[in-house]
A protein has these predicted regions:
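N-terminal cap/lid segment of alpha/beta-hydrolase-fold proteins
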Residues: 42-92
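Primarily recognizes the serine-hydrolase "nucleophile elbow" in alpha/beta-hydrolase
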Residues: 194-257
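Cap/lid segment of the alpha/beta-hydrolase catalytic domain
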Residues: 114-189, 241-253
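Short beta-strand/loop motif that positions the catalytic acidic residue
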Residues: 280, 286-288
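Short beta-strand element of the alpha/beta-hydrolase
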Residues: 83-86, 94-103, 123
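Surface beta-strand/loop "capping" patches
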Residues: 338-381, 393-407, 458-464, 501
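Catalytic histidine neighborhood in serine/cysteine hydrolases
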Residues: 307-323
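Extracellular ligand-binding interfaces
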Residues: 465-470, 479-563, 569, 576-607
Length: 608
């Protein structure tokens, strides 16, 4: 009898817990939704109480910031709560607001919310990864018996050793069968929708003026949340593209994540961002980098092509991976000013462009709008199907009236990608969180000609017409920089460069009386798997402060793995000069800094 009572109480408890679950578990494979619309059907992000708890509040300079936690839901009988910063301008008004979602390895930031409050926005910055936010506050995100985080390195209560990307069940998943609800992205999208609910319930927020933005993983969360009809605009950063399970044309090994999923069909129709963009009704500003590993360039346009409305823009920082510049960051302010606050920053439309092919030549034209504010129009092209490591060649364009045009040769069994970046003047400089800018950049449509058969080996057969690797005649147009000092390029991946391993780097330097050190870094990351040799470095203290030439053999580069560098397998090449007297890096993005390096060549050196 006693055993019966225990059994009965246990079952009643399980029934009670099951009844309070945010999602009833799917019992069979047949119960599992097969598309994104069905997956979210019936879920109401407002249904459950948020149970908001204010942990701490700061009030300073007309800005209020609160450290809060609120309930995401109940999963496997345990409550999941997320911590966040809620910031708003203390102006007595109902402000436009948006949710910010940080990227992988990152955390919510109090100063980010403070900055956007100075711009007139209320924000909730969700700390989905669970990293510490304040040194004196232990209360934080607690996912309970589920875990969509990145393992114990970041989240002290992690239930798994690392990142769960597949849809298969385990002891910490919602469903006991393969299901999209077992993917970490699903739980993060639930938390994102709950954050929208939190924001719309705040008395300082105008619930009809809500947006969503996020960086990297936060960009993917943005994409999976953008179908929420409460949102009036979204702006994903370096994340949020679809088709992540597919390899690039030419079957670039490792470029797709399909190997992680046992059921790629279920993934592609329920969790991949391509399953969501067709149902996004609000305006989209996609902000990224030309060589981004996470939001691959071509996939951005493939994703935007799924939208059923034309109200979208793309802006990418050139020759950069995972690093938007000030000309991109400012567009978050401009986009939300226009679509959330009802201001009119007059963001031009996507620059109209055309593309045609005839007699072995492709013709590309672009006719940007708002040319009274237009400062520059740059056209870029590439034959490389690997958008993570391709070098975007700057094309010499002809201007006729209001239109720029270029002609580019087409090669058999090689794709061709071409687009334009248009730089505009802002009405006045805008102070960003960390920098200031007086300009912004918008991309045209990317036009792609992809043959039925893509043979990447044909890239090495193209004519070798590039004699000078760099002479800075056009400044750092072909380079990028994170710190405005070291400069990095993908130029080793341009097919017009002779990358024979018998060649050497010839670097002409003019220290102009300074005691300098030269540092070179080369990396193969994000090339196809078979070509990824790892990272290499070279360091040399210049023995003279007079003009000189330095020869660098590929064997001179050091590898922590003991490998030998191959010129054709250099994806990124970084140059740094250090003033040995001050131990400070020379600012190579400046004209003065570039004057120290007269030229860089990759060529065969006789008598060596």
């Amino acid at each position: 009898m006693q055993l019966f009572r225990i059994f009965l109480l246990t079952n009643l408890l399980n029934l009670s817990l099951c009844g309070n679950e945010t999602f009833q578990p799917y019992k069979t494979v047949g119960d599992v939704p097969r598309d994104a619309v069905e997956l979210w059907r019936g879920y109401d992000a407002r249904a459950e109480p948020l149970d908001v708890r204010i942990i701490k509040q700061w009030s300073e300079d007309g800005i209020v910031t609160r450290y809060v936690t609120f309930r995401v839901g109940t999963f496997k009988g345990a409550e999941s709560r997320i911590a966040a910063y809620y910031s708003y301008p203390d102006n007595g008004a109902k402000n436009a607001g948006f949710v910010w979602s940080h990227g992988g390895g990152q955390r919510a930031e109090r100063n980010r919310g403070r900055y956007f409050a100075t711009q007139g926005y209320a924000t909730v910055d969700i700390n989905w990864l669970g990293r510490p936010m304040e040194s004196d506050i232990e209360i934080n995100t607690d996912w309970g018996k589920v875990d969509p985080t990145q393992g114990p390195r970041f989240y002290s209560k992690a239930l798994r050793s690392g990142w769960k990307r597949n849809l298969q069940p385990d002891e910490f998943s919602i469903d006991p069968v393969a299901s999209p609800r077992n993917a970490n992205w699903f739980l993060l999208a639930v938390a994102a929708r709950r954050a929208i609910t939190f924001l719309e319930q705040q008395p300082e927020v105008n619930a009809s003026q809500l947006g969503f933005s996020g960086f990297s993983m936060g960009g993917m969360i943005t994409a999976l949340t953008a179908t929420d009809e409460r949102l009036k605009a979204v702006a994903p950063f370096v994340g949020g593209t679809g088709f992540k399970h597919l390899n690039f044309p030419g079957d670039v090994r490792g470029s797709g994540s399909g190997a992680h999923f046992k059921d790629t069909d279920l993934y592609s129709k329920t969790i991949d961002a391509s399953a969501y963009w067709p149902f996004v009704k609000c305006p989209v500003m996609f902000i990224s980098s030309s060589n981004d590993f996470h939001s691959a360039f071509d996939r951005i346009y493939q994703s935007m092509a799924l939208l059923k409305h034309p109200n979208w823009r793309v802006s990418t920082n050139m020759h950069q991976n995972h690093g938007p510049g000030p000309e991109q960051w400012v567009l978050l302010n401009q986009w939300f000013d226009q679509y959330l606050r009802g201001l009119n920053p007059s963001i031009p439309p996507t620059p109209p462009s055309t593309f045609s092919v005839s007699d072995g030549l492709a013709t590309f034209t672009v006719t940007p709008k708002n040319q009274d504010r237009l400062l520059d129009t740059e056209v870029y092209f590439s034959y490389d199907p690997n958008s993570r490591t391709r070098f975007w060649n700057h094309a010499s364009s002809q201007k006729t009236g209001d239109t720029w045009s270029v002609q580019i040769p087409v090669h058999e069994n090689l794709p061709l990608y071409v687009f334009s970046l248009c730089r505009y003047r802002l009405n006045q400089p805008v102070q960003l969180q960390r920098e200031q800018t007086a300009t912004f950049a918008l991309n045209s449509l990317e036009h792609a000609l992809i043959p039925e058969i893509v043979d990447r080996k044909q890239l090495s057969q193209l004519p070798k017409t590039r004699d000078v690797f760099e002479d800075f005649q056009f400044g750092t147009r072909d380079w990028s920089s994170r710190d405005q000092r070291s400069i990095k390029t993908y130029k080793f991946q341009t097919p017009d460069l002779d990358r024979s391993d018998s060649n050497q780097l010839l670097i002409r330097l003019n220290p102009r009386g300074k005691r300098l050190a030269l540092r070179l870094n080369a990396g193969s990351k994000f090339l196809s798997q078979e070509n990824n040799l790892g990272d290499f470095s070279y360091v040399k203290n210049l023995l003279s402060n007079e003009p000189q030439e330095i020869l660098v053999n590929r064997h001179d580069f050091k590898s922590t793995e003991g490998k030998t560098l191959e010129w054709s397998k250099v994806a990124t090449f970084e140059v740094t000069l250090v003033d040995r007297d001050t131990n400070e890096k020379v600012m190579l993005t400046s004209k003065a800094g570039q004057g120290f390096i007269e030229s860089i060549k990759l060529k065969k050196i006789d008598n060596q």
